[in-house]
Amino acid sequence: MVLQDLGRRINAAVNDLTRSNNLDEKQAFDDMIKEICAALLSADVNVRLVQSLRKSIKSSVNFASLPPAVNKKRLIQKAVFDELVSLVDPHAEPFRPKKGRSNVIMFVGLQGAGKTTTCTKLARHYQMRGFKTALVCADTFRAGAFDQLKQNATKAKIPYYGSLTQTDPAIVAAEGVAKFKKERFEIIIVDTSGRHKQEEELFTEMTQIQTAVTPDQTILVLDSTIGQAAEAQSSAFKATADFGAIIITKTDGHAAGGGAISAVAATHTPIIYLGTGEHLMDLERFEPKAFIQKLLGMGDMAGLVEHVQAVTKDSASAKETYKHISEGIYTLRDFRENITSIMKMGPLSKLSGMIPGLSNLTAGLDDEDGSMKLRRMIYIFDSMTAAELDGDGKMFVEQPSRMVRIACGSGTTVREVEDLLSQHRMMAGMAKRVGGQKKQMQRAQNMLKGGNKEQQLAAMQKRMAAMGGAGGGGFPGMPGMGDMAKMMQMLQGQGGGGGGGLPGLGGMDLQSMMSQMSGLMGGGGGGGGRGRGR
């Protein structure tokens, strides 16, 4: 992952400071800033930006003027976080397409940056959100450009327009946009040829296309591997095409990536999406605070919820699974649905970055091995009968020969079948707890409907204290419910089901679920197998 090493180094610098027992203000603070600046420079972030960030952090923490009661370590952490956010946030609002009218989006960028693939990714992204989308290939310079766009668009089931005979890209773009406007398409994305700041003819061609289609938004596609050249190239494109947004591609690689971030400061233009892989679904919405949180290992739960909602949208089976879990039931079919949802969400490394604390747990896992193990689990499910899938797994205990039959039918081993069933038992136990908690919350809601709520809440708090439940640690199995104000929100139906749950995954505690899943994908599984194999 791009900038992963940068995140580790910055995190280590801040953690070293916060772990020290005595804060030697000057020495510890200067050492931390020095390490952060060295990490940013090694990640190809522009030198002037690093110097500016250094001054900003120093000026925002004035030890002499702080009251004695202030937690200086927390203040330093916040200063570092805020300055890193400002590094990637130009405070410019990007264009937002409107439904019911044609929104023309034009892509520009260097050759090989991934424009054509990103065009299809963005079209698919908007298509999944209810927009009527289309693609126009105005790249008449590169051999095979139209064929590539045609192949991608066909795969994503998106209408496209291009020409194998017309060589003037401005004419092709104008014809394509006019055609799709007439057919009332809401998002029309125009792909153009890759160009370099030294190629004046291609830059002139770009302005001609822009004049022909009058786009509502022009997007610069920037390769994360470009390094220090990013600032000069993006400035040249800004002067000619005046783009209003940036998409950074190839962020799943191991390049430094800081150069692309420098382009934000150089052009005062917001990053709107990150390309996180070669597949059409590998496009993440960029949000500065969430990006820095992930960079520092703090997770991005809001992004995860949005991702899960997009994947499980309108899924009848996901709704059925949620209903089962809310009742404390978890069948093998429900488990299969959860595995399918996780596979749709992308590689485990991508998901783990969104969950606080889980990125370290999955650091050594190979995504390809992990996805293969998930596929083998699906093979096992597909070899089960309807009665086995809709059961609770007890029939396998009563008739172990069923495991042998399933292993033979799925091309797996008996040990793998045993591991899957063991994992299901753990998940079923979690579902049972979620169902029990929901019933308790319903009883508490009913109890609070009449009478003095404050008195009833105080009485409940006393009972919890007597049971050892009120110490700020929250209820068992319900993360983040430490204070009573949050409890009131949940009692009134505002907190969602289960505190740590997510739609499409049945409201279960996803962090626990993913931790167990990563264990299984890492080879150990849930344990509990008797070691037999075939």
Curated annotation (Swiss-Prot):
InterPro entries: AAA+_ATPase, P-loop_NTPase, Signal_recog_part_SRP54_M_sf, Signal_recog_particl_SRP54_hlx, Signal_recog_particle_SRP54_M, SRP/SRP_N, SRP54, SRP54_euk. Keywords: Cytoplasm, Endoplasmic reticulum, GTP-binding, Hydrolase, Nucleotide-binding, Ribonucleoprotein, RNA-binding, Signal recognition particle. It is found in: Cytoplasm; Endoplasmic reticulum. Residues 297-534 are annotated as: M-domain. It is an enzyme of class 3 (hydrolase). It holds the Pfam family SRP54_N. It catalyses: GTP + H2O = GDP + phosphate + H(+). The keyword Hydrolase applies. One of its GO terms (cellular component) is signal recognition particle, endoplasmic reticulum targeting. It comes from the Eukaryota. One of its GO terms (biological process) is SRP-dependent cotranslational protein targeting to membrane, translocation. GTP binds at residues 109-116, 191-195, 249-252. Coiled coil: none annotated. One of its GO terms (molecular function) is GTPase activity. Signal-recognition-particle (SRP) assembly has a crucial role in targeting secretory proteins to the rough endoplasmic reticulum (ER) membrane. SRP is required for the cotranslational protein translocation for ER import and preferentially recognizes strongly hydrophobic signal sequences. It is involved in targeting the nascent chain-ribosome (RNC) complex to the ER and is proposed to participate in the arrest of nascent chain elongation during membrane targeting. srpA/srp54 binds to the signal sequence of presecretory protein when they emerge from the ribosomes. Belongs to the GTP-binding SRP family. SRP54 subfamily. The NG domain, also named G domain, is a special guanosine triphosphatase (GTPase) domain, which binds GTP and forms a guanosine 5'-triphosphate (GTP)-dependent complex with a homologous NG domain in the SRP receptor subunit srp101. The two NG domains undergo cooperative rearrangements upon their assembly, which culminate in the reciprocal activation of the GTPase activity of one another. SRP receptor compaction upon binding with cargo-loaded SRP and GTPase rearrangement drive SRP-mediated cotranslational protein translocation into the ER. This is Signal recognition particle subunit SRP54. It comes from Aspergillus niger. The lineage of its organism: Eukaryota, Fungi, Dikarya, Ascomycota, Pezizomycotina.
